[in-house]
UniProtKB/Swiss-Prot annotation:
Described function: Binds as a heterodimer with protein bS6 to the central domain of the 16S rRNA, where it helps stabilize the platform of the 30S subunit.
Quaternary state and interactors: Part of the 30S ribosomal subunit. Forms a tight heterodimer with protein bS6.
Keyword Electron transport set for record: no
Encoding gene per record: rpsR
Family under the similarity heading: Belongs to the bacterial ribosomal protein bS18 family.
MF-aspect GO terms: small ribosomal subunit rRNA binding; structural constituent of ribosome
Pfam family, one: Ribosomal_S18
Cellular component aspect of the GO annotation: cytosolic small ribosomal subunit
SUPFAM superfamilies found in the cross-reference section: Ribosomal protein S18
UniProt-listed GO biological process terms: translation
Keyword Electron transport: no
Designated name of the protein: Small ribosomal subunit protein bS18
InterPro entries: Ribosomal_bS18, Ribosomal_bS18_CS, Ribosomal_bS18_sf
Species, as recorded: Bordetella avium (strain 197N)
Length: 90
């Protein structure tokens, strides 16, 4: 004989369903940007983590063409010392 145990009751979520995720959208497509500039540091900082890593497109919702431009712009800004490679070590 198989033992199935007690049946678990279904939970009713009063808040949002944790499995439902909001659809991400590309900021650059919405703004009509044609090319990402390496001198626009405020925009570039939004796509870099505190430890210096570039945030992947699957988390930001950026389209592939803009993610490649963003990657190049961040690397170019790092090379020119406009952005740090890593976080500040205290």
């Amino acid at each position: 004989m198989a033992f199935f145990g007690k049946r678990k009751e279904k939970r009713k979520f009063t808040q949002q369903n944790p499995l439902f995720k909001r659809r991400k959208f590309c900021r650059f497509t919405a703004a009509g940007v044609e090319e990402i500039d390496y001198k626009d540091l405020d925009t570039l900082r939004d796509f870099v983590q505190e430890n210096g890593k570039i945030i992947p497109a699957r988390l930001t919702g950026t389209r592939a063409i803009y993610q490649r431009q963003l990657d190049s712009a961040i690397k170019r800004a790092r090379f020119l010392a406009l952005l740090p490679y890593t976080d500040n070590h205290n």
